[in-house]
Design a protein with these regions (language model features):
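Short, small-residue-biased leader/transition segments that mark boundaries at the very start
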Residues: 1-5
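C-terminal regulatory/interaction module of P-loop NTP-utilizing enzymes
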Residues: 7-180
């Protein structure tokens, strides 16, 4: 989250990452419809939603089945988690994103920050081998990192617009990959 906030008379500051897991009834799983109605009212406030970077559509992730289980040699999950933990502290990926992403003038700062953080996360997961901006295939970065990050943030904006008219018909800024 990494933000300063005020809630119900409490001032706070956060630099932690948070993941909310939950089930939304199948009939409500429509990003273009209001999905948050069955959640606690705290999660139906635009101020909190604005601090959530993106929404992962769980219904697009295949259900676990026997065909997805591995046999034989595999990557140890504890080792993999250790790698991810180390990558979390590696700021070089964010520096790469800063160098290759172009932000339009007057773009909303919170949207821009959310998209950049999500794109950085995708970069770490999908292209952990990159060490500088010259190692990045710009088209792959756009297709696999930046575009999905913007889609994840767009769902948040759509949900905000269904709660408060201030956010209605507002889209995320169109971040682009710099050509050079």
């Amino acid at each position: 989250l990494g933000d300063v906030y005020k809630r119900q008379g409490y001032n706070g500051e956060s630099d932690a990452g948070v993941v909310f897991l939950g089930n939304i009834k199948e009939e409500n799983m429509d990003e273009y419809g209001y999905m948050l109605g069955e959640l606690p009212t705290l999660f139906q406030e635009t101020a909190l939603l604005d601090r959530i970077h993106g929404f992962v559509k769980g219904w697009d992730i295949p259900r676990m089945n026997d065909g997805l289980k591995l046999t034989g040699w595999a990557l140890n999950s504890e080792y993999f988690c250790s790698i991810l933990h180390e990558l979390r502290n590696d700021m070089s990926y964010r520096a790469i994103v800063e160098k290759i992403v172009e932000v339009p003038k007057h773009a909303d700062t919170r949207d821009t920050e959310a998209i950049k953080r999500l794109a950085t996360a995708y970069l770490k997961l999908l292209f952990p081998n990159v060490r500088n901006e010259f190692d990045v295939d710009k088209m792959e970065f756009r297709d696999y990192c930046l575009t999905p990050a913007m889609k994840m943030r767009r769902i948040i904006k759509l949900q905000q617009g269904m709660i408060d008219s201030e956010y209605k018909n507002k889209d995320v800024p169109c971040l682009m990959v710099r050509e050079k």
